[in-house]
């Protein structure tokens, strides 16, 4: 029977390590890292990714991707998957979808987001939710197990920028979907 576990908490709360510890003595684990190093990425993020890589057991498989996770799960048969994390996957999908919507590669995505109307925002949110639904469906179809790490969001002030508000709301929608399915 397929199993989905959701681990949530604040930024830097240790949730990734908790998830890794759950599978520490397991073999056949595939770690799906949703933050991928890009050419223009800042050194702080590169260091964070490096630390995460170093923490993983040597016999785990690492798959760095945030797109087509459901297809990857359907095409493979690992005993367990650890997806770290849904928030980064959402962020990456969001910026890809905005750039695609405005044919703006690499472009100025910040300006594009400021121009977005309600229908465009809802369209992107729907697409992102569909991606996560496909991941859950792929687990059910293959009877596999996955733990997903995600950030708790929305407990503080209302973000000042439109971009931050859209992302906060999108993270919340993703977390609702995953919580219902886990």
Which residues does each PLM region occupy?
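Conserved P-loop
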Residues: 2-75
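Loop/turn-to-beta-strand initiation segments
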Residues: 77-80, 142-147
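Conserved, surface-exposed functional patches that form binding/active-site neighborhoods
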Residues: 80-106
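Short, solvent-exposed loop/turn segments at secondary-structure junctions
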Residues: 90, 155-162
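A solvent-exposed, charged loop/short amphipathic helix patch at secondary-structure junctions
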Residues: 98-124
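Catalytic-core regions built around general acid/base machinery
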Residues: 130-143, 174-177, 181
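Acidic, metal-coordinating catalytic segment for phosphate/diphosphate chemistry
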Residues: 151
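Phosphate-binding/switch region of NTP-binding enzymes
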Residues: 161-182
